[in-house]
Every structure is written in structure tokens, then in C-alpha cells.
């Protein structure tokens, strides 16, 4: 799926240094008007809410604002009802909020777009998912809704089943000194051991 171009005309001031959402904790150099971080995948579950934070370590202004969109129906745009999922207050860094994933969100991978822009009418604001703003930055991420983005373990004939599981999993073909970690669909560590 190809999305509309977005960015800023001036990437030297208001920029994004970090985005934290679900299991995403992505630092960036914040040097361009657009960064493609779709190789970074966040795992979310329908019906759950997740804290969101974007920040910049440099200069920010009281008119700066972050807006987030998720292409829930995977149609290549962020224009459908409910796809603008967060609009922060106008303030200096950090910009925070909570994003609720609808129970009806289809499972699978889609794109999340994050825009930081200066909302002042003096600096060509752009509160839409497409096009450029005068100042700011846009970053795209991949979200995996409803299932972990992890392929079946094949190395050394290790077998984990059933997948998905609700309360019991079986692991076979491992030595008694094997370390393990189990993560929820939301990316939280729920169990670990040897």
C-alpha cells in the first residue's frame, strides 16, 4: 500500500526525537521532514488502550502539536472515520495521550502516521495526514493488530503450540536449561524462566 507524501518544508526546528507507543520505543536523528520507520512494528490488541508519547530533545514551541492516524481499514489513506486517533494539546515537548484500538479493528498489519507540526498560522500549519507543514516532521510506523508479528520457531526443531494460545502453551524439543520469555499481543512480558 502506498500512502500520500507528507513532511515539512523546514526540518531544522521542530522535529521528533522519540516515539513510544505499545512496544515501539523508537529514537531518531530527527534530521528530515519525513522518516519511514515502517520496519519498526508495534503490536496492539483490539479493545485495548496504549499510552503514546512523542518528544524532541531540541527546541520546541508552545504552538507545537502532534497528530496520529492509523489506517484501520488498510485502504491506503487516513481519511476514514475513526482513523485520526490522537490530537495532542498545543505545547512544548513531550506530547502525550492515549490511543484506544477499536474492538472492530481488523487483524493484521497496517500503517500508523505521526505528524508534529507548528500550529501557528504564521508558519504554514498542516493538521492533515498528507502534504507538508511549514515546520515539523512526519514518521510512519507499522502496527500489527491482534496477533504477534513473530513467525513460528523452527530453529533446532523447537515446536511451540497451539498458536494462538489463551492460557496454556506447549514447548517441545528443548533442553532443560533453555531460557524462555513469553510476551502478550500488546508486547508486555508476561512470563519468563529457565
Where are each of the predicted segments found?
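C-terminal outer-membrane/trafficking sorting elements
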Residues: 149-194
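A broad "non-catalytic interaction surface" signal
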Residues: 1-147
